[in-house]
Each structure stands twice: as structure tokens, then as C-alpha cells.
Amino acid sequence: MDAENYIYHKEAITMDFYKRALELKDETVADRRYIHENAEAGLELPKTKAYVMDKLKEYGLDPVECGEGVTAMLGNGGKVLLLRADMDGLPMPEKSGEAFACPTGKTAHTCGHDFHAAMLLSAARILKEQESKLKGTVKFMFQPAEETFQGSKNMIEHGILENPKVDAALAYHVSPGKMPVGLFMYNDKGTMMYSVDGFKITVKGKGSHGAYPHAGVDPINIGVHIHLALQELIARETDPAHACVLTIGQFKAGEAANIIPETAVLQGTIRTNNTKERELLVRRMKEVAEKTAAVYNGSVKIEMISEVPPLICNPALTDEMIGYMKEMDIPGLTPVPDVSASASEDFAVIAEKVPSTFMYLSAGYTDERGTYPAHNPKVQFNEDVCPIGVAGLVHCAVQWLKKH
């Protein structure tokens, strides 16, 4: 299809973009499978970043590094819409059985970020084909380290929201499970995903022989009391009407049974859907740890590993974007409102700074392939979601820029 021959009016444009996305499906899937098979985790993704930049150049864009991520722009001045895709995997083995599974046994795309990057690449290609007709500017954000909650912050610090200033932002996340492809899930009334404040408490005691505990200060004993005291914060200091979770997921201390160690380390997360409760819990976590340690003659060092707010989508922008999604004549496309999840997403850092919308796109199966959830080594995602995601990104961008 000649890109310049698209019929550019509301009634026809949506189906044309979906048709174009279907034409590009094989290439989108190939991009997804390459990124999947070469999964990288964390802040530095050299192979993934190089692949994304090469593809953008192939499509006629001029990508540049932005911190540890990649950005590119196209359009004609005016308002600026940011389209964001994360592209990092997880530090875990893959057992999906797919022919393109990551072979290293150390990293895997079990959260679908390979889809996000591949769909945004194809969306960039279509938008480049339509650049002369755009009524504004689209900025693309290919982000690392979402899983460690570092990526958005890294790219913000390197200017992703400036030069030109971003006016609004949109991101998708694919969702596996036992459900058909075609659902798009959103929340325009409240918190869509919880905050996450990751913390590390290093308890400092005094080492001694296990036979002479009085000669030392036991950091394991202090750590146990800190752990128990922190659970009371949820039970007795937070409003039961608000969802709050405090979890200690790691407790490490000692090397031998007859030695009281010098230190113990606790790591955990605080998650909530309420900003005030978040502030309370972070402050009280620090106070409880410090004062409990002091009671037993020890001390603590507290480090905040991640600080991500709740993901709260802008209601007006979300209503607008959902309206554009509903315009698309795609078989099986179905809105699912009022979705909220206790997981966290560092797109919330973007949403805290500019009006933003975040949607889940179902990428599941109704048979046994939909058995496993995200972050499971056996999870499988349905590649039929690809043209839906591509068309949605393009259509929402075109329509939003046209209106604004």
C-alpha cells in the first residue's frame, strides 16, 4: 500500500492504519522475536538499543541516545505527544518452549517489553510515512530498566521531556493470561497501579562468638524485631480503606552457625494506591528501623532503592484516548474500564510530570497457553496483539495532534 494514498479522514483513517499494521505484522513479530531472543536486563541494553536505533534509521528517523535509552522525533512543530515503550527483560531463565526463547538461561522477556519496543518501532514507521500530514510532533521514548524502576528517571534526567517540551504521554503494556486478544484496559477515575518504594536496611551490630552473645550486638535479633515491627505499620497505622502492602523479601545474615555476624541486611518494598499513605509508610519505616535498632544497641543504614509514585492517569486525556481507541474498527476490540493493579510501573514518573494515559492490551490465549502470568518462566504471549497495538499508537497520536 502506498503510504501517501491513505484516505485521511475520520471515517477511513482508523481502518487504513489497522490495515497498514496488519501488512507490517510479520516485520513487527520479527522485531519482537529478535529482541526476545536477545533479551537484556537492567539499565544498559547495548544490543537492544543498537537494534532499535538501526531500525529507526532504516525508517528515515534520526534516533539519538537519551541517557541509557533511545529517542527520536518526527512531525511539524506544534504540540508534542510522547509515545513510550520499555525494552528491558528480567534476570531469570526462560522455559516457554518457544523456538525464539532466550538461550542464555540468565535473561528473559517474561513481561512483554519486547512487544512494546517492536510495536513502537512499527508505529514510528507508519507515522514517518504520514509525517507531512501530522498536526504536531511525536516524540518516541525507548526506555531501559523499567523492571528496576530506574529507566524513566534516567531518561527524564537526560531531557526526554524537554527540547521540545512534552505536552502529553501515552504507553501500552501487553497482558498475558486466559483472555482473548482485543481487550484494552484502563482507569480514568483513580490509581491504575500502585507506588513502589524499595528499601534496603543494613543492620549494624557487633560480631562475637555464638557462645558469648553478651559480648556482641546481634544484628539478626535486631533485624527480626524490625521485620515484626514493620508489619504493625499496615495493621495499626494505615487506613483500612486504602490498599497498602509492606513486604520484606530478603533477609541475609551470617556465614556460620557459631558466629554472631557484624551485619544483617533486609530488603523490601512498600506499595500503596494512596499518596498520603505512601509518605506515611516510608517515613515510619525509617523511624521504626532506626529506633528499634537503638533499643538493642545497634544502628541501621537505610537506602531507598526505588521511589516510584502511584500511576494515576490524567482523567481528561484518558477519556480522550479511550474515545480514539473506540473509533477503531478492529474485530474483537473491547474496552475494559476501572482496572487497578497492585503491581507498579515506572511510567508513573512520567505521569507525575505530564498528563499521561496508560493502557493494558490483552495478549493472552483462551487455551492452555494462557496458563502462566507475567514474570513466570513459562509465560507465552499472543503475537496477534501486535497490529492492534501498532494501530492504536498511530491512531491515538494522529487524532490527538489533530485536536490539539
PLM-predicted stretches and their roles:
Residues 58, 224-404:
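Metal-dependent amide/peptide-bond hydrolase catalytic core
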